[in-house]
């Protein structure tokens, strides 16, 4: 059964000064899938995510759940679309649990309900033990996990219309929490029929957790396919200038990118 398209962008272009960041991108994302946006530094991954999320405003054609982006009120869309940025500039001395509870602002819930939902996602992202810590005193990875819990809280009451966007969510995390974050994202997609779009640099992490890979290079999509189809020595060489061999994980059976020499 074909999955419904919940987010579509057509002919998306973006230019900063004289630099063409994105060039006529056509892309669609479905419910229940994890899509990794990949590519070298400067390929346009984060810019595409910001354009799709509305963080960068545009008059170009973007649709959420079949409805033009410009037709959505911000408050209504925030119940269905959550964005985890690469970093946060929050400096106010909130307690960690208060940061997570900020995700419930768009929701009409009692304080007890907000607390219960926030605690659920704090447990999932392994930050319960930080609940009464001051946010500014936390490490970068701890802050990132808190904000992940906040975004999951934001989407808790959105029914079957959920889009979760993660911009390099593993960049500040240790090995165990990198895998836990992507495991939670994949579980969120499958169990809640959510569309999950994640910007990553690690091809092997993407191969393990993503259903699709959209690989960009110089502002254009080079390939949009499954990990098995996208990860070839030829594509990796053309995009990254890196000679690679493709193997298989011995127990989990996903493609592994390895150095050719």
From Swiss-Prot:
Subunit note: The complex is composed of two ATP-binding proteins (HmuV), two transmembrane proteins (HmuU) and a solute-binding protein (HmuT).
This protein's GO CC annotations: plasma membrane
Organism: Vibrio vulnificus (strain YJ016)
Family of this protein: Belongs to the ABC transporter superfamily. Heme (hemin) importer (TC 3.A.1.14.5) family.
NCBIfam families: PRK13548.1
GO terms for MF: ATP binding; ATP hydrolysis activity
Disulfide topology: none
Protein EC: 7.6.2.-
Keyword Methyltransferase belongs to the record: no
Protein name as it appears in the record: Hemin import ATP-binding protein HmuV
Membrane topology field: Peripheral membrane protein
Top-level EC class: translocase
Domain ABC transporter: 7-243
Major location category of this protein: membrane
Cell compartments where the protein resides: Cell inner membrane
Domain of life: Bacteria
InterPro entries in the cross-refs: AAA+_ATPase (IPR003593), ABC_transporter-like_ATP-bd (IPR003439), P-loop_NTPase (IPR027417)
Positions annotated to bind ATP: 39-46
Keywords noted in UniProt: ATP-binding, Cell inner membrane, Cell membrane, Membrane, Nucleotide-binding, Translocase, Transport
Pfam families in the cross-refs: ABC_tran
Function: Part of the ABC transporter complex HmuTUV involved in hemin import. Responsible for energy coupling to the transport system.
């Amino acid at each position: 059964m074909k999955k419904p398209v919940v987010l579509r962008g057509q002919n998306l272009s973006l230019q900063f000064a004289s630099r063409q960041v994105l060039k006529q991108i056509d892309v669609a994302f479905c419910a229940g899938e994890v899509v990794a946006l990949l590519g070298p530094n400067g390929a346009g991954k984060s810019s595409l995510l910001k354009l799709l999320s509305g963080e960068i405003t545009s008059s170009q054609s973007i649709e959420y759940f079949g409805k033009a982006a410009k037709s959505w009120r911000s408050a209504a869309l925030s119940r269905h679309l959550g964005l985890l940025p690469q970093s946060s500039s929050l400096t106010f001395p909130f307690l960690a649990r208060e940061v997570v509870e900020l995700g419930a602002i768009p929701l009409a819930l009692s304080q007890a309900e907000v607390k219960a939902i926030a605690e659920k996602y704090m447990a999932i992202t392994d930050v319960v033990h930080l609940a009464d810590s001051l946010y500014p005193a936390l490490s970068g990875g701890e802050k990132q996990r808190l904000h992940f819990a906040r975004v999951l809280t934001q989407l808790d009451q959105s029914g079957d219309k959920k889009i979760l966007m993660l911009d390099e969510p593993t960049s500040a995390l240790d090995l165990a929490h990198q895998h836990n974050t992507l495991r939670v994202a994949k579980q969120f997609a499958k169990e809640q029929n959510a569309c999950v779009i994640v910007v990553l640099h690690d091809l092997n992490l993407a191969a393990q957790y993503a259903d699709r890979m959209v690989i960009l290079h110089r502002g254009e999509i080079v390939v949009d396919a499954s990990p098995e189809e996208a990860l070839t020595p030829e594509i990796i060489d053309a995009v990254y200038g890196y000679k690679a061999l493709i193997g298989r994980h011995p127990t989990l059976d996903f493609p592994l990118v390895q150095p050719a020499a």
